[in-house]
Amino acid sequence: MSASFTTIAWRNDAVLLLDQQALPGEERYLTCTRFEEVLTAIRDLTVRGAPAIGVASAMGIALGALSLPDDSPEAFCNGFEALCDRFAQARPTARNLFWAVERMKRCFGEHFHPDTSSECSSAAPGKEIARTLAAVRKALVAEARRMAEEDVAINRRIGHYGQVLIRDGYRILTHCNAGALATAGYGTALGVIRAAREAGKQVQVFADETRPVLQGARLTAWELQKENIPVTLITDSMAGFLMKQGRIDCILVGADRIATNGDTANKIGTYTLAVLAAAHSVPLYVAAPLSTIDRKLSSGNEIPIEERPAEEILTIRGVPIAPAGVEVYNPAFDVTPGHYISAIITEAGIAEFPYESSLERLFLSFP
């Protein structure tokens, strides 16, 4: 089962993005020919979801490298560093963004050696400089495209491991969108649901709308309908009542950053669901690639939380819904403590509490 749309792709020296701001009303694509357009798309949620942001950042960096100056290796190197810095500042919470920037920097370091050094230098003759920089650009584009291909394969492995947790007939609650729209393809949390369906299991999805930007209503419901997966849309405030009624068998969410103790930053409202799930003995599963795990962080207290514009709460699709001048607090994410999470599903297998040891075992076991 594969999605009938493309979230992100490299086409003819440009980055093709499905405009998720236009969904569900219109399925349209943006062709970004300048890296600034990719940056804007990341910031304004045209492309969103941690894995998709990572791939978009890599492609944006590769795109920007195509127009870096050829005057000297030093100018090229300085321009590349500035380019990476711009993308690293695009959104602060998504670990995959920083992972992608770091990986593109490594690729650059491996191929940028005009004078047999990875340091910025202007020592090489003109023609040799041009050949070297052309090779660097080619390598960066290839790396970004490789990351997109790897992401789809990783998501399929997440689905393979995660679907064993899903029994036939399960009723699954989702939050935000962690599907093909949030990745280069297939999805993390929705990838588990796809894999369960491919294994012949029947499932029913309850998608909560996910205020304030309505990713559940606009994106998850749209994506599941495209796949003919049964989905029922609910408001965020209905989730607890469904659990009380015994109508939810498990909760499946993605993640934007995970600390080594399992504390998980995900779309605002995830923590609320986790507390409700614990009160009703409903398992909550997090599906995310290993690249989302920040091994430098010992707990979720260290995860930076992005705050979004007030307009996201004050308006819906441009229509005001609150009195002018009211104060607004709009964190994009919250952090769910690891002890509320029943399992973290990765491409290397499933980790369970306590996560410090189980996640480390997955890292050690995976190439």
UniProtKB/Swiss-Prot annotation:
Site features described as Transition state stabilizer, chain residue numbers: 176
Keyword Isomerase assigned: yes
Pathway recorded for this protein: Amino-acid biosynthesis; L-methionine biosynthesis via salvage pathway; L-methionine from S-methyl-5-thio-alpha-D-ribose 1-phosphate: step 1/6
Residue sites binding substrate per the record: 48-50, 91, 215, 266-267
BP GO terms, sorted: L-methionine salvage from methylthioadenosine
Keywords: Amino-acid biosynthesis, Isomerase, Methionine biosynthesis
Root EC class: isomerase
EC number per UniProt: 5.3.1.23
Catalytic activity: 5-(methylsulfanyl)-alpha-D-ribose 1-phosphate = 5-(methylsulfanyl)-D-ribulose 1-phosphate
Gene Ontology terms for molecular function: S-methyl-5-thioribose-1-phosphate isomerase activity
Residues of the active site: 256
SUPFAM superfamilies: NagB/RpiA/CoA transferase-like (SSF100950)
HAMAP family associated with the record: Salvage_MtnA
Protein family: Belongs to the eIF-2B alpha/beta/delta subunits family. MtnA subfamily.
Function field: Catalyzes the interconversion of methylthioribose-1-phosphate (MTR-1-P) into methylthioribulose-1-phosphate (MTRu-1-P).
NCBIfam families given in the database record: eIF-2B_rel, PRK05720.1, salvage_mtnA
Official protein name in the record: Methylthioribose-1-phosphate isomerase
Native source organism of the sequence: Syntrophus aciditrophicus (strain SB)
Gene that this polypeptide is encoded by: mtnA
